[in-house]
Swiss-Prot record:
Keywords: Aminoacyl-tRNA synthetase, ATP-binding, Cytoplasm, Ligase, Nucleotide-binding, Protein biosynthesis. Its EC number is 6.1.1.15. One of its GO terms (cellular component) is cytosol. It catalyses: tRNA(Pro) + L-proline + ATP = L-prolyl-tRNA(Pro) + AMP + diphosphate. CDD domains: ProRS-INS (cd04334), ProRS_anticodon_short (cd00861), ProRS_core_prok (cd00779). Homodimer. Pfam families: HGTP_anticodon, tRNA-synt_2b, tRNA_edit. This is Proline--tRNA ligase. Catalyzes the attachment of proline to tRNA(Pro) in a two-step reaction: proline is first activated by ATP to form Pro-AMP and then transferred to the acceptor end of tRNA(Pro). As ProRS can inadvertently accommodate and process non-cognate amino acids such as alanine and cysteine, to avoid such errors it has two additional distinct editing activities against alanine. One activity is designated as 'pretransfer' editing and involves the tRNA(Pro)-independent hydrolysis of activated Ala-AMP. One of its GO terms (biological process) is prolyl-tRNA aminoacylation. Consists of three domains: the N-terminal catalytic domain, the editing domain and the C-terminal anticodon-binding domain. Disulfide bonds: none annotated.
């Protein structure tokens, strides 16, 4: 492809609202343009990469035994009401009405419609298992779209679903998709890790995320030498053992803390550290208030609390609910005496709260805190559990060794859904005894557009993108210099271009009438694996200049040996 005939608008500077490396480079390199908040156009160069990812994923899905379908983006309210998600999916679900007033949504996922497809046609265990997949644009009305195409409102993904009669069957197919995703990540040239994950809005009872490792990743991964790995939303922490208290238990005492509503403010006022505090948080779980207690320097993991409560929805309580539950103000509520005021309320405490001796808590009145608070003596939680987000120093819940922490970008997610959707939607089959059962289901999503961004986050330098060879939109960036003053340059360039393309290599020929510096900058920005330069200086010596994108220096090679170079290119694809 000649650049003079190709639509490739590059930019010297990234737009100011581009907030990640991948967003900046995708915009500058002409892969995408922004239409609206969280919505992007994919230009020819970006689309070539997207289609390469799509083909890799398609090949692995086919190899796993799944079959491709095409499902509607616009889905009727009635299907989502059957699953219950019309109500609890929340504002991220974009809802619309047609001219007759019928309600629909722009699908962020496809569990409902695929379950409807299968329940209409699959009635017997003899027809199982079934595995179907699709590539489709999805829409999720993110409250704050960010990170370019990684957290966009409109995105492109592959989602697959499997239906089974037995637990053995779903386990077998879950492993098939798990291995297929590992192959996808390997073929894309990624350094990656598969980690245990929370099931989130999809639901189910078991899931893994496939993380592309990158320092700029939005997800933190807790990783142990024993082989256990999970994102910090899911990571199980070893239950701490607390030695007998060395300090003498002191009598609780109220202290004035005027206008000090944060742990930081009170700690400074009292000359204490955050780990001495008992933090009280109020939530509503499926509409019912609950109280969580954390050590002051720890962050509550809402996913763990939600799972513990087996709640569909968990939200932070508003000020009115907070006051009703605690009888106090935000920043001043504490566990001491709370059960006496509100006997029906349940206290859920993280394990680490049990280790606090002579701690500090809210005094349940304005501008007052209580010091010398000790759990079990001054209050008793209903439940102790692992409720914290894993952080530096925490021990692995499987073996007790210290976690290592890395960052990653989620590109794929696999779920064992069980009967979450089939039961609520009455999707059933008959077994060999003519007894009816809900399908056991699996769900397997992979973000095609996210993979493109993740590749850039993992592989780039100060000059631009460094594409892994399997994802590169072209194999070679061929640069011609001095064609206007030296006919020999054009002759040799055309010859090499023809030889490369006839060998099945994809070549982008920069034949623009631009300065060499501009061409070289664009070559680095676009990030193709190989660069060849033909100029007056090289043809004089019967040579061409060759540079790998990952190398700092270019080397000279003989034009007569181009056939050997072609073999190297073919081997590296």
């Amino acid at each position: 492809m000649k650049l003079t005939q190709y639509y490739l608008p590059t930019l010297k500077e990234a737009p100011k609202d581009a907030d990640t490396i991948s967003a900046k480079l995708m915009l500058r390199a002409g892969l995408i343009r922004k239409t609206a908040s969280g919505i992007y156009e994919w230009l020819p160069l970006g689309l070539k990469v997207l289609k390469k990812v799509e083909q890799i994923v398609r090949e692995e899905m086919d190899a796993a035994g799944a079959h491709e379908v095409w499902l509607p983006l616009i889905q009727p309210k009635e299907l989502w009401e059957e699953s219950g998600r019309w109500t609890y999916y929340g504002k991220e679900l974009l809802r619309i009405k047609d001219r007759k007033g019928a309600e629909f949504c722009f699908a962020p996922t496809a569990e409902e419609v695929i379950t409807d497809v299968v329940r209409r046609d699959v009635t017997s265990y003899k027809q199982l298992p079934v595995a179907l997949y699709q590539f489709a644009s999805k829409f999720r009305d993110e409250i704050r779209p960010r990170f370019g195409v990684m957290r966009a409102r409109e995105f492109y993904m592959k989602d697959a679903y499997s239906f089974h009669a037995t637990e053995e069957s779903i386990n077998e197919w879950y492993l098939k998709f798990f291995e297929a995703y590992k192959k996808v990540c390997t073929r894309c040239g990624f350094k990656f890790k598969a980690v245990e994950a929370d099931t989130g809005a999809i639901g189910g009872n078991f899931s893994h995320e496939f993380m592309v490792l990158a320092d700029t990743g939005e997800n933190e991964i807790a990783d142990c030498d024993c082989g256990y790995a999970a994102n910090t939303e899911k990571a199980e922490i070893f239950k701490p053992k607390f030695p007998a208290a060395k300090e003498e238990l002191k009598t609780i005492e109220k202290v004035n803390t005027p206008n000090a509503t944060t742990i930081e403010d009170v700690a400074k006022m009292l000359g204490q550290t955050a780990d001495r505090f008992i933090k009280l948080l109020v939530f509503t779980a499926d509409g019912q208030p609950v109280v969580a207690l954390m050590r002051g320097d720890h962050e509550l993991n809402e996913h763990k609390l939600k799972a513990l409560l087996k709640a569909q929805e968990l939200e932070k309580a508003n000020e009115e609910t907070y006051a009703k539950v605690t009888g106090s103000f935000v920043g001043y509520a504490g566990p001491v005496g709370l059960k006496e005021k509100n006997p029906k309320i349940k206290l859920f405490a993280d394990y680490h709260v049990a280790g606090i001796v002579n701690g500090i808590a809210g005094g349940n009145e304005k501008d007052v805190h209580i010091i010398n608070v000790t759990p079990s003596r001054d209050f008793t939680p209903d439940v102790y559990a692992d409720l914290k987000i894993a952080s530096e120093g925490d021990l692995c819940g499987k073996c007790g060794k210290k976690f290592n922490f890395t960052r990653g970008i989620e590109v794929g997610h696999t779920f064992k859904l069980g009967t979450k959707y089939s039961q609520s939607m009455k999707a059933e089959f008959l077994d060999e005894n003519q007894k009816s059962h809900p399908f056991l289901m699996g769900c397997y999503g992979i973000g095609i557009s996210r993979i493109v961004a993740a590749a850039i986050e993992q592989s780039h330098d100060e000059n631009g993108i460094i594409w892994p060879a399997p994802l590169a939109p072209f194999d070679i960036y061929l640069v011609s210099i001095d064609t206007d003053i030296n006919p020999k340059v054009k002759e040799e360039t055309d010859s090499i271009y023809n030889q490369l393309t006839q060998a099945g290599l994809n070549v982008l020929l920069d034949d623009r009438n631009e300065r060499p510096g501009i061409k070289f900058k664009d070559a680095d920005l676009i990030g193709l694996p190989h660069r060849i330069v033909i100029s007056s200086r090289t043809v004089e010596t019967g040579e061409y200049e060759y540079k790998q994108r990952t190398s700092k220096e270019a080397i000279r090679r003989k034009l007569a040996d181009i056939s050997e170079q072609i073999k190297e290119f073919q081997a590296s694809k």
